[in-house]
Amino acid sequence: MKKFKVLVLTVVAVFALSSCGTTQTVPLTGRTHRISVSDEQILSLSNQEYTKYMASAKKSTNAAYTAMVQRVGKRLANAVELYLKQNGFEADVKNYSWEFNLVQDKSANAFCMPGGKIVVYEGLLPYTQNETGLAIVLGHEIAHAVAKHSAEQLTKQQNQQTGTSILGTVLNQTVGNGVGNVASAVAGRYFSFRNLKYSRDNETEADYMGLIFAAMAGYDPQQAIPFWQRMSQGSSSNQSDIFSDHPSDTKRIADLQKEMPTALKYYKPQTTYKVGSTSKTSTTKKTSSKKKTITRRK
């Protein structure tokens, strides 16, 4: 009976780890999540990883494309910071030290480190085709940083590692050798599937937020649809996303179409340029991005 009580209490304690940390609110969506790592910790790790990556990466030698990445990135960053300051997230602005780099890599990819360190691969540009397409991608990557998805996932990983380790040890001691190993594997699978779902949710949330950020910066959010269609056509597969950490292209496009009416409420066209040039395509007066959190359509 004593062993059984220890077992039950320990299992409860292990799964309670998932609720540790401080509750924080994601800008724009209003979603709350629990974070157990500090901004200082995540920024330190991020800066180390970014410095290591850039030390070996080859920066693009295309001056026009590099200037475009920096121009679009800075415009998005300004719009995002303005929104954060006007909507109660002033404290988060200090975490960003924006950098925008274009590197020589044929992969169609981009990423944004916590703290605003952004890298775009040259292989992505044929898909973005213009500044607006690039803004859709950068808005998405910036959204990951603003929503603190890295800290959220790190929190989950810490809880998983601690929880499965404790559970396996206690079960081996209270029930018998070997049982704890099986239980740890089962618990790890539970956490893995849960984290997998949350990761896909993070991607969907970043799509939504990125769409809004692009609109705030004066880029037409409707161009997200043809961009993802191009990405879908260039993808080697478009299989079901049930075991993927990213939504399928089909699901992603459908979700973006559903959110488009909300994004258009933020959209006011501004000056844009053709790819690799300084030729203006449209100009209007910049507007405020002061908007309260909007409940997302289901």
Identify what each model region corresponds to.
Residues V11-A13:
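N-terminal leader/targeting signatures
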Residues F15-S19:
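C-terminal motif of bacterial Sec signal peptides marking the signal peptidase cleavage site
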